[in-house]
């Protein structure tokens, strides 16, 4: 085994061998889903043909959870070279709606006008409401950034995520933002904008408003609400998120985000619930719980869930 001193003296950054190791692990269907997610979370920090090709291949994986996360990663990376393959994913109605939705969101995150025709086509023709709503968001995001001339520096989230909507304009009160978020007649983009403004506020009243949105009609909005609550890691949301995870009639994309959010909050009740629903018959839910529990185990043991690039593949478990 390589010593810590030797590893520490290595040049920081992935070697070609490390990159190949991560790509192979991501695409190895014989590996546990949590290990494949470790590779995915590591590859999203890289750029170039190898990581892009592996993530695009993973976007058509038999695991819908992994496939949608791969598409999400490409959007967060804002890799324009991935656009043709992401467009092909969006058009492929044989793929799960959660994967098509994430491809549409990724196109919006990359934000190039050449994606507009397909997003408009899918908005009109895709049979899944959650995909239609995502296309609406992506189109509005591209349009708003173009018209406002928004620079990248002004759109970076304090949570380091590329969000599907820009936060609502400053000056609105938490009460006003709550009303917009909970208004079923309001456009999806404006509700998302209110959501991200409330997240950035993050005070108790803002968190309460976000939690209330878990009762919305739109599965797409509810899944983003759960995602945001995971970013905030506020224990005040635990009971509401637990209720969502337990509801087998809820859309899998919402339950999956609730599971991941509970993993971020990580109190004892949340962990027990994740262990219970790691046996859920819906793979999107059970695999989410499995990944969340694995991440918590690494955190407890003081190890990194992501692979450390200054190490060789053979010593990753010793990080």
Swiss-Prot record:
Organism classification: Eukaryota, Viridiplantae, Streptophyta, Embryophyta, Tracheophyta
GO BP term (any one): peptidyl-lysine modification to peptidyl-hypusine
Pfam families for this protein: HEAT_2
Binding site for Fe cation 2: 223-224, 256-257
E.C. code: 1.14.99.29
Cofactor requirements of the protein: Fe(2+)
Signal sequence segment: none
InterPro entries with a match to the protein in the record: ARM-like, ARM-type_fold, Deoxyhypusine_hydroxylase, PBS_lyase_HEAT
Pathway connected to this protein: Protein modification; eIF5A hypusination
Positions with a binding annotation for Fe cation 1: 68-69, 101-102
Keyword entries, A-Z: Hypusine biosynthesis, Iron, Metal-binding, Monooxygenase, Oxidoreductase, Repeat
GO MF annotation terms: deoxyhypusine monooxygenase activity; metal ion binding; oxidoreductase activity
Species this chain originates from: Oryza sativa subsp. japonica (Rice)
Gene3D superfamilies: Leucine-rich Repeat Variant
Cofactor note: Binds 2 Fe(2+) ions per subunit.
Name the UniProt record assigns to this protein: Deoxyhypusine hydroxylase-A
Membership in a protein family: Belongs to the deoxyhypusine hydroxylase family.
Classification via HAMAP family: Deoxyhypusine_hydroxylase (MF_03101)
HEAT-like PBS-type repeats: 66-92, 99-125, 188-217, 221-247, 254-280
Catalytic activity reported: [eIF5A protein]-deoxyhypusine + AH2 + O2 = [eIF5A protein]-hypusine + A + H2O
UniProt-listed PANTHER family: DEOXYHYPUSINE HYDROXYLASE (PTHR12697:SF5), PBS LYASE HEAT-LIKE PROTEIN (PTHR12697)
SMART domains according to UniProt: EZ_HEAT
Broadest EC class assigned to this enzyme: oxidoreductase
Role, per record: Catalyzes the hydroxylation of the N(6)-(4-aminobutyl)-L-lysine intermediate to form hypusine, an essential post-translational modification only found in mature eIF-5A factor.
């Amino acid at each position: 085994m390589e010593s810590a001193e030797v590893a520490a003296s290595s040049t920081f950054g992935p070697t070609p061998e490390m990159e190949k190791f991560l790509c192979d692990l991501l695409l190895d269907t014989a590996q546990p889903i949590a290990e494949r997610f470790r590779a995915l979370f590591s590859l999203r920090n890289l750029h170039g043909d190898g990581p892009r090709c592996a993530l695009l291949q993973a976007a058509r994986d038999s695991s819908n959870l992994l496939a949608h996360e791969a598409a999400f990663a490409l959007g967060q990376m804002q890799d324009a070279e991935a656009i043709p393959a992401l467009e092909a994913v969006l058009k492929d109605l044989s793929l799960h709606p959660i994967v098509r939705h994430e491809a549409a969101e990724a196109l919006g995150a990359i934000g190039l006008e050449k994606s507009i025709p397909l997003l408009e086509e899918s908005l009109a023709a895709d049979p899944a409401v959650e995909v239609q709503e995502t296309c609406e968001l992506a189109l509005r995001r591209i349009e708003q950034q173009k018209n406002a001339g928004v620079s990248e520096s002004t759109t970076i989230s304090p949570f380091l995520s590329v969000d599907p909507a820009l936060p609502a304009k400053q000056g609105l009160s938490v009460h006003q933002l709550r009303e917009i978020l909970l208004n079923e007649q309001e456009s999806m983009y404006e509700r998302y904008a209110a959501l991200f403004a409330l997240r950035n506020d993050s005070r108790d009243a803002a968190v309460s408003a976000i939690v209330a949105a878990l009762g919305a009609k739109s599965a797409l909005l509810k899944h983003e609400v759960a995602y945001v609550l995971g970013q905030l890691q506020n224990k005040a949301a635990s009971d509401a998120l637990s209720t969502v995870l337990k509801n087998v009639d809820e859309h899998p994309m919402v339950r999956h985000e609730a599971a991941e959010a509970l993993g971020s909050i990580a109190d004892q009740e949340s962990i027990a619930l994740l262990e219970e629903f790691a046996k859920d018959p819906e793979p999107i839910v059970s695999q989410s719980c499995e990944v969340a529990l694995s991440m918590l185990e690494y955190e407890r043991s003081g190890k990194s869930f992501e692979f450390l690039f200054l190490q060789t593949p053979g010593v990753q478990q010793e990080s």
